UniProtKB/Swiss-Prot annotation:
Gene Ontology terms: cellular component: cell cortex; endomembrane system; lamellipodium; membrane; perinuclear region of cytoplasm
Domain of life: Eukaryota
InterPro entries linked: Kinase-like_dom_sf (IPR011009), Prot_kinase_dom (IPR000719), WNK_Ser-Thr_kinase (IPR050588)
Residue numbers spanned by region Disordered: 1-70, 409-437
Comp. bias (Acidic residues): 43-57
Name of protein: Nuclear receptor-binding protein
Main location: cytoplasm
Residue ranges with Low complexity bias: 27-42, 414-432
Entry-annotated residues carrying Phosphoserine: 2
Domain Protein kinase: 68-327
Subcellular location: Cytoplasm, Cell cortex; Endomembrane system; Cell projection, Lamellipodium
Swiss-Prot/TrEMBL domain comment: The protein kinase domain is predicted to be catalytically inactive.
Single biological process term from Gene Ontology: epithelial cell proliferation
Gene that produces this protein: Nrbp1
């Protein structure tokens, strides 16, 4: 949802320029003035650089801090301005995005739609989709804005990478093309499996990001779906060829528009660039047909042509494309084993691989595939799988570079509106009373509870380790009285925002089990009890 280009907003006495937006009714585009870069840094510029980290604003919960440095969002329609921000809980940079409403009444008319769309976006959890963290509304007397926090992508876009590759007179590696297509389709299949399906609607090589390790992430997942649940901005002529023919002709477009856009991305990835029509950058149909004919692989050509069918109903789904012969390969035992290890990594010590392999005979047989009569078995030696290479491969699998597509793909958790409190908060006057804790929505994947004796018969000490799904660890401790109510303690942790309401019953069971184990063992030589559970 963001690019790795940034610039500093300069404070001035003049008002920012306000332009009308062609997106949702009531939205305005605020374009603050920005600095231009010069070769020699003046004292004023040095001072501006020092001010980049200045905190301009904080989120209501205090976790997100907006900085002065603006992030370039030229390819993300619907976002009026975006700034670098700091996640004070994780200690990482994020993007502070703002959507402006020209009048407060325009926001009020769309408030429920805004909540529904953004509640859905927060639920999205996929390694190949830029993470959407949080949102809230800032409603004032005569205007309103919606602010949402997204993952900061410091890497460049796929378009930039393809341009560099062509400039260096290189061709696209077929394995890389397959790997990228698989990651993009895995993300699209995830979005399209939502109920109702989430249509990206703005998929181009400019809104796909590639990291240094080859990980692909699609960004700008429709913040302006508050209007039609799809992106409708077709301002930039250079990207018009990414939009399906039915755009603008039908009221309700389907997920097939994303398949058409993906097909165009796949073609551009294969040929590096589709030549436009002179300076206008407009890409005519003839140029697209010529680019397809340049493809030497007939399977690759057929794959792309299926995506670019003019009739939406004839285009395959993202799931079907993952099984097309141009992409699909039976997953190797190595890949299956890696996914199994990654899925149970909380049960495996960090240095387990190194400990297991350091004393092994590298000439020994690691695995063997038996063969028929008269044929030699196929053997894999330990020397063919060095520990460092395995560590790198496991890290790539963990990051989402090699998704498993032959099995059920991850499905999004559907938000339950009656249970999940909307993060939109109304404006309030600051008072000395403490604000209520932020509601926790992340799932706990690992819980560990330890109880030890402090004063015999008077009190015990409880320590709780919680590992959340985004790898955040919480370490909590308190004194536990003999007559303490375990359900009340679990409910208090929910109220304070340490765990989600969905994990309350699991935590209650863990606390009760640990306490029972402690009571059973404290008469022996042991004065402590520990229980661990994982989801």
């Amino acid at each position: 949802m963001s690019e790795g280009e940034s610039q500093t907003v300069v404070s001035s006495g003049s008002d920012p320029k306000v332009e009308s937006s062609s997106l949702a009714p009531g939205l305005t585009s605020v374009s603050p003035p920005v600095t231009s870069t010069t070769s020699a840094a003046s004292p004023e510029e040095e001072e501006e650089s020092e001010d980049e980290s200045e905190i301009l604003e904080e989120s209501p919960c205090g976790r997100w801090q907006k900085r002065r440095e603006e992030v370039n969002q030229r390819n993300v329609p619907g976002i009026d301005s975006a700034y670098l921000a700091m996640d004070t809980e994780e200690g990482v940079e994020v993007v502070w995005n703002e959507v402006q409403f020209s009048e407060r009444k325009n926001y009020k008319l769309q408030e429920e739609k805004v909540r529904a769309v953004f509640d859905n976006l927060i639920q999205l959890e996929h390694l190949n989709i830029v993470k959407f963290h949080k949102y809230w509304a800032d409603v004032k007397e005569n205007k309103a804005r919606v602010i949402f926090i997204t993952e900061y992508m410091s890497s460049g876009s796929l378009k930039q990478f393809l341009k560099k590759t062509k400039k260096n007179h290189k061709t696209m590696n077929e394995k890389a093309w397959k790997r990228w297509c698989t990651q993009i389709l895995s993300a699209l299949s995830y979005l399209h499996s939502c109920d109702p399906p989430i249509i990206h609607g703005n998929l181009t090589c400019d809104t796909i990001f590639i990291q240094h390790n080859g990980l692909i992430k699609i960004g700008s997942v429709a913040p302006d779906t508050i209007n039609n649940h799809v992106k409708t901005c077709r301002e930039e002529q250079k990207n018009l060829h990414f939009f399906a023919p039915e755009y603008g002709e039908v009221t309700n477009v389907t997920t097939a528009v994303d398949i058409y856009s993906f097909g165009m991305c796949a073609l551009e990835m294969a040929v590096l660039e589709i030549q436009g029509n002179g300076e206008s950058s407009y890409v005519p149909q003839e140029a697209i047909s010529s680019a397809i004919q340049l493809l030497e692989d007939s399977l690759q050509r057929e794959f792309i042509q299926k995506c670019l069918q003019s009739e939406p109903a004839r285009r395959p789904t993202a799931r079907e494309l993952l099984f097309h012969p141009a992409l699909f390969e039976v997953p190797s035992l190595k890949l299956l084993a890696a996914h199994c290890i990654v899925g149970h990594q909380h049960m495996i010590p960090e240095n387990a691989l190194e400990e297991i392999t350091k004393n092994m005979d590298t000439s020994a047989v690691l695995a063997e595939i038996p063969a028929g009569p008269g044929r030699e078995p196929v053997q894999t030696l330990y020397s063919q799988s060095p520990a460092l290479e395995l560590d790198k491969f496991l890290e790539d699998v963990r990051n989402g570079i090699y998704p498993l597509t032959a099995f059920g793909l991850p499905r999004p958790q559907q938000p339950q509106q009656e249970e999940v409190t909307s993060p939109v908060v109304p404006p309030s006057v600051k008072t000395p009373t403490p604000e209520p804790a932020e509601v926790e929505t992340r799932k706990v994947v690992l819980m560990q509870c330890n109880i030890e004796s402090v004063e015999e018969g008077v009190k015990h000490h409880l320590t709780l380790l919680l590992k959340l799904e985004d790898k955040l660890n919480r370490h909590l401790s308190c004194d536990l009285m003999p007559n303490e109510s375990i359900p009340d303690l679990a409910a208090e942790l929910v109220q304070l925002g340490f765990i989600s309401e969905a994990d309350q019953s699991r935590l209650t069971s863990l606390l009760e089990e640990t306490l029972n184990k402690f009571n059973f063992t404290r008469n022996s030589t042991l004065n402590t009890a520990t229980v661990t559970v994982s989801s």
